[in-house]
């Protein structure tokens, strides 16, 4: 259960230096918290023009039609666009960017899954910033986000101003004004997820001294070897995912 305050705080608690009246092309499902909060509510708060993409099949056409400055994406979309950029690596970067996104385009916000840092470097060559974040629906949804010029490799950004975090037995706990009230009519599940206002994310990770969040895997996915060592399969999957053969 997310309240009006939960969503409003998540959308407005951080000044991300997004120019007012930016044009946003919304390509993710609006019923998902990520799109609802960061495309729609954040866009409203900044006076942005929000253009709704009617189908992923039409995304390229709609980019040319609406000429957005900003888009929210999930890593799978970014990987697909990266192939176009890589295929045109021998052409002038400005020309490729203008053909794929338009000269006015400058920022992609990424969330929902792991993003290979190499893609961030690739898009930078074409004058496009990828700002990665981390969150979950139970947190309305953003927990941390990257700011332009303040990226740390392998990090999923800095904690939102209305959020604090701690690590308990390797698991990341978060607390703040964006954390849900509970699961609707599911008291046992709510009790399991929340402890004195702290939400158990189920993610393994830590926060460094500057407030940057790092994720190392999912608690439920841990593989315990015969000698008692904990192995996170996500590290292996992410490494394999960099191979063009996979």
Model region roles, listed by residue range:
Residues 1:
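Conserved adenylation A10 loop of the ANL superfamily
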Residues 8-23, 30-95:
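Conserved AMP-binding/adenylation subdomain of ANL enzymes
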Residues 50-53, 117-169, 178-181, 191, ...:
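Conserved ATP-binding loop and adjacent catalytic segment of the adenylate-forming AMP-binding
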């Amino acid at each position: 259960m997310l309240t009006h305050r939960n969503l409003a705080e998540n959308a407005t608690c951080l000044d991300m230096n997004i120019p007012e009246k930016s044009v946003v092309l919304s390509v993710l499902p609006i019923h998902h918290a990520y799109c609802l909060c960061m495309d729609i509510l954040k866009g409203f708060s900044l006076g942005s023009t929000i253009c709704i993409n009617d189908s992923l099949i039409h995304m390229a056409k709609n980019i040319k039609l609406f000429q957005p400055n900003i888009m929210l994406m999930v890593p799978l979309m970014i990987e697909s666009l990266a192939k176009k950029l890589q295929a045109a690596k021998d052409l002038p970067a400005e020309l490729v960017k203008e053909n794929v996104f338009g000269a006015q385009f400058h920022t992609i916000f990424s969330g929902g899954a792991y993003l290979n840092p190499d893609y961030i470097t690739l898009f930078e060559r074409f004058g496009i910033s990828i700002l990665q974040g981390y969150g979950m629906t139970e947190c309305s949804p953003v927990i941390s986000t990257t700011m332009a010029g303040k990226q740390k490799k392998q990090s999923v950004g800095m904690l939102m101003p209305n959020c604090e975090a701690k690590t308990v037995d390797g698991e990341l706990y978060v607390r703040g004004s964006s954390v849900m009230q509970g699961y609707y009519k599911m008291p046992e599940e709510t009790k399991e997820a929340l402890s004195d206002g702290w939400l158990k994310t189920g993610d393994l990770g830590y926060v460094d001294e500057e407030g940057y969040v790092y994720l190392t895997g999912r608690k439920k996915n841990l593989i315990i070897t015969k000698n008692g060592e904990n192995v996170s399969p996500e590290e292996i999957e992410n490494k394999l995912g960099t191979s063009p053969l996979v």
